[in-house]
Amino acid sequence: ALSSAASDVYKRQNLLSRIEELKRRKGAVILAHYYTLPEVQAVADFLGDSLALSIEAQKVEARTILFAGVHFMAETAKVLCPDKKVLIPVPEASCSLADGCEAEAFRRFRARYPGHTVVSYVNTSVEIKAQTDVCCTSSNALKVVESIPAEQPILFAPDRNLGAYVQKLTGRTNMVLWDGACHVHEEFSLEKLLALREEHPGAEVVAHPECRAYITAVADFVGSTAAILDYCGRSDAQEFIVVTEAGILAEMQRRYPRKRFIPAPPDDDTCGCNNCFYMKMVTLERIAACLENESPEVVIDEQVRRAAERSIRRMIEIG
């Protein structure tokens, strides 16, 4: 009999060839986010951060897009490609940022700040994007805010850490922040990060702007996942302490095999909090089943879709 390790490899190979075969048969492409499991990243036709994935979704020629990521990302693809079938293998894979900013509560919040331009991070539901003037990602939040006249007040949602970081860089005093945070980026420990830096004196600290201000303040580089990846290639450092979701380490190692990447520890060592639990729900099994059944599919009310499309397209125009 096959050993259990060998039978796992055999099962995995079977699954991979089934996914490839289903992709061909259904005319589907797979878009995946950097925070998904390494084996999911391996079956993707395109891998990126949320800005790159939004842009790529529009270019896809296939009639079916399977989105390996969390729910709001698949919604964004559907908003931009209404005539395509957008499949989401795990519709219950949500996001603490999106969940913490509910459409009705946001409507009330906006009503308290009339005359403010609404800038929403893409980590929100399509209903929030429909109430938004312009979306942003962590790649272009600074650019988006800078595109708005300095005297024009801004309502920024839902990530208070990203909002505060942009506020600091622009020196704006007229930004109101929704009080939301990412459960992964909120959990990193400053104490442990500084201790790790002492153990690795030559290492550079690279952090995501969703982290708390006391983390970004000590980082050598702060940027989106795509920006961090590029920076690690440009930098002369050979070691990096990575203060973002640990899924990115697979791509870092793949791109820069000679460099060393150390995941930053969360406050609570037992929780595995530097992994996005939702992203890791997307497995090869769920992808295969989703392709097979061409379901679950993302469905969005047309009026909501059109309103959301305006704010997303404005973001993409800004770049």
PLM-predicted stretches and their roles:
Residues A1-A6, Y10:
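Single conserved hydrophobic/aromatic residue that forms the stacking wall/gate
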Residues K11-A28, R314-E317:
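N-terminal basic/disordered segments at the start of proteins
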Residues D99-R108, E127, D133-P149, F156-L162, ...:
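Active-site glycine-rich loop that binds ribose-phosphate moieties when present
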Residues L87-P114, L177-E186, A264-K280:
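Long, charge-dense
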Residues L47-S96:
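Active-site cofactor/substrate anionic-group-binding motifs, chiefly glycine-
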Residues D45-L53, D83-A93, V134-S139, T173-C182, ...:
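Short hydrophobic/aromatic-enriched beta-strand-loop microsegments
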Residues A227, D236-A237, T244-A250, Y256-G319:
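C-terminal functional extensions of proteins
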Residues G27-T36, V40-A42:
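N-terminal glycine-rich anion-binding loops that anchor highly charged ligand groups
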